[in-house]
Amino acid sequence: MANGLFTYVAISLFTIGPLLALFIPFVWRLVGSSLGWYLRRKTDGRRCHILEVVEADERKYRDSKSAKGRKAEKEDRDTFNNTEATGTSDGKVYDKDWDGIVGFFHPFCNAGGGGERVLWAAIRATQKRWPKAKCVVYTGDHDVSKEAILSRVEQRFNIHLHPPTVNFLYLSTRRWVLASTWPYFTLAGQSFGSLIMAWDAFSLLVPDIFVDTMGYAFALGFSRFLFRDVPTAAYVHYPTISTDMLESLDPASAVGSQGVNAGKGTGAKGRAKKIYWQLFARLYSLMGASVDVVMTNSTWTQAHIEKLWGPVRNLTGAVPGIKSKVNPIAVVYPPVAVEELEQEVEVSPESEKRRENVLLYIAQFRPEKNHQLIVQAFAEFLKSGSEAARDAKLVLVGSVRDDYDSKRVYKLRLLVNELHIKDRVEFHLDASWPDILEWLRRASVGVNGMWNEHFGIGVVEYQAAGLISVVHDSGGPKLDIVVEVDGEPTGFHATTSKEFAEGFEKALSLPNPYAVRLRARKSAKRFTEEEFARRWIEQLEKCVAIKAVEKPKSRQ
């Protein structure tokens, strides 16, 4: 009897199994398409309203420009209608007449950091390439108006946008992605929160192209689940989780002494953390595999994203909603204010005479910035008693966000006292931009102590100002920024305090520092806003091309 029942169940499973394998993906797609259809129906009214508002604002804007004179109108037209079509990987050129809606998922758009510079530079490049396109930013900054945000963009980044085609939709669920909301299982919690926030965004408007510029891979995967005909693009500043993070948990690994979680993979709690991170990394890989166009800010980030997302992206039909991707993961360096620094900071034989033996470290006082390592290295450098060390000074410039940062500054001051170098180290907290520029003019060396800095905008700023860099031998500063130019060095790399001390000695003892400064400034030209715009357009054109192919198809 038992054997017969077992045989019956086995035969049933053997027969039904293949059907289930076909049926489950079908149901999965059906659920996603149904939810997507519901969201489209729900937001059609707002879509029409946005198009009407853009048209009305465009008329008002043209009228105001006409009132100011033909010259102002011509300058504005030249500013936003001068980017040529560059074509896509399929050999076709998609002209400027594309007039769809590009949704930028950036819940903290008014923060004013490097990530926000990328967002606004991307929107400006998009406006110049497709003047008829509408750029919609999903943000959680309820306390500021469109006018206030755009004014801050001009003041903070000197980026001038075309106001009529920029709109903001305000999210009410941003708290779900705050680390403070998830004191435990923070990575998983914030990723789950991004799904809630993405639903909030799509409940406001379904865009024609969906772009994430903050690193919410789960939101992009959710978009693909709901709208299979909406191309997605990701600009990845850093992977949410990386292989280096996983390896750093093991004290015996090559990176077991680096990072804020170094060596924490031991014991029952440590092993549980490692399993949790490994499971999360697999989910993260699945989400990233669904993205049509992936851009990273550096070679380091590209390598880690390829390692995590690449294997699944190359599969065909292995996961519902994921198909083979022909678009390679591209490096698009973030825009840095190189031109502004070139104008503000002189690099010449005359200015060389005004440089001081100052080691300048510009960074927020966060634990990963590793200020302690730099202070210890500077103390070792002074102990050498070399000619370069006699009048050297270390200047730490950075912002203090909260009480935790204040405590770190206090501990650094204690360390400086313990090392008896108080009179050789200066702290400048929350310095203004003019003050920072003045230090960039005076200093000789720029320092960066962070392990695996994903890119390193501050290091590019050092180079643009003509400083000789001594940076951590990892991440973007090593692979992309402080590299040779014309076969000659632009700076030095280090890992330990001893190596940093040696790097300080080399940087301050160069026989011809002016030549190195010129090479450093030449190196920085690779990271201009113009170069970013060119690469950004090249990648976003792929999304427009996908949309052009999908357009004849009926909406799902």
Curated annotation (Swiss-Prot):
Q: Which cysteines are disulphide-bonded?
A: none
One GO term of the biological process aspect:
dolichol-linked oligosaccharide biosynthetic process
The compartments listed are: Endoplasmic reticulum membrane
Q: What class of enzyme is it?
A: transferase
UniProt membrane topology term:
Single-pass membrane protein
Which residue spans adopt a coiled-coil conformation according to this UniProt entry? none
Which residue intervals are annotated as intramembrane in the UniProt record? Answer: 185-205, 455-475
Q: Provide the Gene Ontology terms for cellular component.
A: endoplasmic reticulum membrane
Q: Where is this region: Disordered?
A: 64-86
* UniProt KW keywords: Endoplasmic reticulum, Glycosyltransferase, Membrane, Transferase, Transmembrane, Transmembrane helix
Example of a GO MF term? GDP-Man:Man3GlcNAc2-PP-Dol alpha-1,2-mannosyltransferase activity
EC number(s) recorded for this UniProt protein: 2.4.1.131
The record's Gene3D superfamilies line, in alphabetical order, gives:
Glycogen Phosphorylase B
Q: Which residue intervals are annotated with compositional bias (Basic and acidic residues) in the record?
A: 64-79
Lumenal side residue ranges read: 1-7
- For this protein, the parts annotated as crossing the membrane are 8-28
Report the Pfam families cross-referenced here: ALG11_N (PF15924), Glycos_transf_1 (PF00534)
Which ranges make up the Cytoplasmic topological domains here? 29-184, 206-454, 476-556
Pathways per UniProt: Protein modification; protein glycosylation
Recorded catalytic activity of this chain's protein: an alpha-D-Man-(1->3)-[alpha-D-Man-(1->6)]-beta-D-Man-(1->4)-beta-D-GlcNAc-(1->4)-alpha-D-GlcNAc-diphospho-di-trans,poly-cis-dolichol + 2 GDP-alpha-D-mannose = an alpha-D-Man-(1->2)-alpha-D-Man-(1->2)-alpha-D-Man-(1->3)-[alpha-D-Man-(1->6)]-beta-D-Man-(1->4)-beta-D-GlcNAc-(1->4)-alpha-D-GlcNAc-diphospho-di-trans,poly-cis-dolichol + 2 GDP + 2 H(+)
Tell me the function of this protein.
GDP-Man:Man(3)GlcNAc(2)-PP-Dol alpha-1,2-mannosyltransferase that operates in the biosynthetic pathway of dolichol-linked oligosaccharides, the glycan precursors employed in protein asparagine (N)-glycosylation. The assembly of dolichol-linked oligosaccharides begins on the cytosolic side of the endoplasmic reticulum membrane and finishes in its lumen. The sequential addition of sugars to dolichol pyrophosphate produces dolichol-linked oligosaccharides containing fourteen sugars, including two GlcNAcs, nine mannoses and three glucoses.
Q: Which family does it belong to?
A: Belongs to the glycosyltransferase group 1 family. Glycosyltransferase 4 subfamily.
The protein in question is named GDP-Man:Man(3)GlcNAc(2)-PP-Dol alpha-1,2-mannosyltransferase
Native species = Neurospora crassa (strain ATCC 24698 / 74-OR23-1A / CBS 708.71 / DSM 1257 / FGSC 987)
Q: What is the lineage of its organism?
A: Eukaryota, Fungi, Dikarya, Ascomycota, Pezizomycotina
